[in-house]
Structures are given as C-alpha cells and as structure tokens.
C-alpha cells in the first residue's frame, strides 16, 4: 500500500463543494490530526485511511476517492466522528461518498453492496434485521452458497440465529416497509439504483 496521495491525478474543483453540500459537513476544516483513524475498527482493510479520504475530498481528487475501497468498507460506527476535534461527522462524509459513487456506477467492493441490499431487503420485509434471511440472500447474490455453512451449528447452539424472523407489534414491519418503499422511489428519482 502506498501512503502517499497522488496529486498528479485530475482534480475536480466542484467535488469538495458537492461533498460538503450533500453531507452537511465542512470537510475543509479537517487539518489531518489523524484522530479519525486512531480507533477505526475497519482501518486495517482500507486502501486509503479516513484522513486520506478527507484530504482527497479537500483536494478535489474525485476519482481517487470514489474508486476507493475504503468508502465501502466503512462500518459507519462513528468512532471517527466522535474523535474529530473539529466535529466533522466523518461517517456521514463516508456515507455521502458511497451514495455519490453508486450514483455514478462506481462500486469498488461489490460484495459489500450485495450484503447491503440483502440486509435492506430483509429489513423492508420484516421491519428489522433477520440474520438467516440476510445470509441466504447474500449467498445467493454473491454466488457463494456454501460459504461459512460450517459456522451454522456453533451459531445455532449459542442461539445467535433464529430460524424465524422476530415480529414487530402494532404494524411496525409494515411501517418500516413503507419507509423503505419511499426510499426506493426517491433513489429512482435521483438516479441511484435502490
């Protein structure tokens, strides 16, 4: 991994403004203290660390940032956001970058997107996460049907997986389904594949 940011790449001067407008964060105030990466639980799989992503946004390095694996590997745990001395919600910036990348058809880690859609499909149907349903959908979408099947007996023995989804009382699942439907309609209007 090369830690240097390649400044010879084409810059998009409007990119910084677009990220700041869409995320509601003043990325320009990041002074590269490194607090965001100090406790990042996913940083070990990043090709660019969070502070490098922020610097790339500041410099208008749109292609480098939107093609990065890091924006897809971010867990959205907000550890970075809580540690930022300038109160930049770095997790929100990463989310914004994922949306921008998807809108342009850039998906650096397709498996993550497949998992994301599998998770959202179970939430839409059942109103909350349904682990086995998410796993089955992900395995089918990624064509990795027997991946991690050997872990199932342990997970079942520890009661970490339920065969049936948990129910939500008082029409909660339907309400969540309506929210998800509105999201899909909005995404289509904005040109993003829901």
Predicted regions and their residues:
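Non-ligating segments of multi-cofactor redox enzymes
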Residues: 1-29, 35-39, 46-55, 62, ...
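Cysteine-centered iron-sulfur cluster-binding motifs in ferredoxin-type domains/subunits
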Residues: 24-43, 68-88
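A short glycine/small-residue-enriched secondary-structure motif
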Residues: 54-62, 70-76
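A compact, surface-exposed functional segment
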Residues: 65
């Amino acid at each position: 991994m090369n830690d240097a940011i390649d400044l010879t790449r084409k810059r998009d001067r409007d990119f910084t403004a677009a990220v700041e407008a869409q995320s509601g964060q003043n990325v320009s105030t990041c002074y590269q203290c490194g607090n965001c990466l100090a406790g990042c639980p996913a940083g070990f799989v990043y090709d660019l660390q969070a502070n490098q992503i922020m610097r790339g946004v500041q410099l208008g390095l749109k292609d480098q940032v939107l093609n990065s694996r890091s924006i897809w590997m971010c867990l959205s745990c907000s550890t970075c956001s809580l540690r930022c001395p300038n109160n930049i919600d770095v997790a929100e910036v990463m989310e914004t970058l994922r949306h921008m990348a998807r809108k342009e058809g850039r998906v650096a880690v397709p498996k993550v997107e497949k998992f994301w859609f599998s998770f959202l499909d179970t939430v839409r149907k059942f109103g909350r996460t349904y682990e086995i349903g998410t796993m089955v959908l992900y395995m089918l979408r990624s064509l990795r049907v027997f991946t991690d099947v050997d872990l199932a007996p342990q997970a079942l023995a520890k009661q970490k997986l339920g065969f049936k989804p948990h129910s939500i009382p008082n029409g909660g699942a339907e309400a969540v389904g309506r929210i998800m439907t509105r999201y899909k309609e909005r995404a289509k209007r904005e040109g993003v594949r829901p």
